[in-house]
Design a protein with these regions (language model features):
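Conserved phosphate-binding catalytic cores of ATP/NTP-utilizing and phosphoryl-transfer enzymes
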Residues: 1-4, 112, 127-150, 166, ...
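Conserved phosphate-binding/catalytic loops in two-lobed NTP-binding clefts
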Residues: 131-134, 307-339
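Glycine-rich phosphate-binding loops at beta-strand->alpha-helix junctions
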Residues: 103-112, 214, 218, 288-309, ...
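Conserved phosphate-binding loops in N-terminal lobes of ATP-dependent enzymes
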Residues: 2-119, 128, 158, 168-171, ...
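Acidic, glycine/GT-rich loop-and beta-edge segments that sit at the periphery of enzyme/chaperone cores
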Residues: 196-211, 215-229, 233, 325-372
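Phosphate-binding glycine-rich/basic clefts of nucleotide- and phosphate-handling proteins
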Residues: 163-262
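Phosphate/ATP-binding catalytic cores across multiple sugar-kinase/actin-like superfamilies
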Residues: 81-90, 239, 248, 252-286, ...
Length: 372
């Protein structure tokens, strides 16, 4: 019996797992840490640490990600180490027995696709490879052929229009702003209530506060006038009053002026992308399928506020078409889309096989994918 394909979503929080399953088996922080100095023989000689192991030893390591903020690969030697960890420690499988679907940004360069193919085929000796557009996979997960994706993750937010299952090149926008920036603003606000979080471990407390306590107000001005009686218990047992921190944190997604940025919020940015289209029908389709994706959109109340902002800003004739789709597990949307897509019968004609790679070389990765 053929073994299931492996799905890898290329992102700062790299999700991996098996084709046909409903959620990833692993979420690995895409970090590689190396010792700041050479260790003596008395210590275990390890050249590098991956993911949470690197974070736990941050005091004695130089840590970096092999991915750029926008999700493109910056260091192929280190990304190979990440993939090796996925195979050997996260999924504990033999790569030679599983096909691989990798979800990458739609504007990934051809030479980078070829390097991915080269590493997967030669270093891991996989039988088949498919390099997929992660935003197209999000629409597969939603079963929507047309729409606009608002995908906000750890470090980047993308607004990408999709038509007939394909990303429309040159029409989307990508911003280097995501959950990391929201966390940094939260930490700044916490300083105002005498809570100082500076170390990597302490900053994880801010992440927990955001998940448990913070929300996006439906009406920010009205929220300011409400009395805030809230309390959070720190790991050491101390209790803190968060006050307006709980609703101000996520407000920067709609009101960047709070952090000194003179630009529009993301709802207006989304409208600007849709309004680039000349066709009324195209605009209607996009407004009727605004798909939220990525962990940064999980902030409580974000979806309702986003829809309210869109409806308040769109041309009057388009208001009734506005529909914001905010499904559960949307932090896993691209991975789930890959799990579904790789299970379809049509994939048998789309895989780049090992034989094709050996005959035509890594360049065929681009040639074959362009035919799909």
């Amino acid at each position: 019996m053929e073994k299931p394909a492996i799905i890898i979503d290329q992102a700062f929080n790299m999700r991996s797992g098996f084709s046909g399953e409903e959620e990833p088996r692993s979420v690995l922080t895409c970090l590689v840490g190396r010792p700041k100095m050479t260790w003596g023989c008395g210590m275990e000689c390890v050249d590098y640490f991956i993911g949470s192991e690197a974070e736990e030893k941050s005091g004695i390591l130089i840590i970096k990600s092999p991915l750029e903020d926008d999700g493109h690969i910056d260091d192929f030697d280190d990304i190979e180490k990440i993939w090796e960890t996925i195979y050997s420690k996260e999924l504990t499988i033999n790569p030679e027995e599983h096909s691989v679907l990798i979800a990458v940004p739609g504007d990934t360069k051809e030479i980078d696709r070829e390097k991915i193919a080269c590493i997967m085929m030669e270093s891991f000796n996989i039988p088949n490879l498919y390099i997929a557009n992660k935003h197209e996979l999000i629409m597969v997960k939603e079963a929507k052929s047309d729409g606009i994706i608002f995908d906000s993750g750890e470090k980047v937010t993308s607004i990408i229009p999709i038509k007939e299952w394909k990303e429309i090149k040159g029409q989307g926008e990508v911003y280097k702003f995501g959950g990391k920036n929201v966390n940094e603003y939260l930490i700044k606000l916490l300083n105002h209530v005498n809570v100082c979080l500076t170390t990597r471990e302490e900053k994880k407390i801010a992440e927990e506060i955001k998940k448990q306590m913070c929300y996006v107000a439906l009406d920010y001005e009205a929220e300011i006038n409400k009395k805030q009686d809230n309390e959070y218990v720190l790991p050491n047992g101390d209790k803190i009053k968060l006050k307006n921190t709980i609703y101000k944190t996520g407000e920067i997604l709609f009101n960047p002026s709070l952090i000194g940025k003179e630009e529009e919020g993301f709802a207006k940015k989304c409208i600007d992308v849709i309004q680039k289209f000349d066709s009324i029908e195209d605009k209607k389709k996009l407004y009727s399928n605004i798909v939220l994706s990525g962990g940064n959109t999980l902030l409580k109340g974000f979806d309702k506020r986003f829809e309210k902002e869109i409806k308040g800003l769109v041309p009057a004739e388009m208001k009734e078409n506005v529909n914001v789709i905010a499904k559960e597990n949307r932090e896993n949307s691209a991975w789930i889309g890959g799990s579904i897509y790789s299970s379809l019968p049509l994939m048998k004609d789309l895989w780049l096989t090992k034989d094709e790679y050996m005959e035509y070389g890594s360049e065929y990765a681009n040639t074959k994918y362009q035919k799909k």
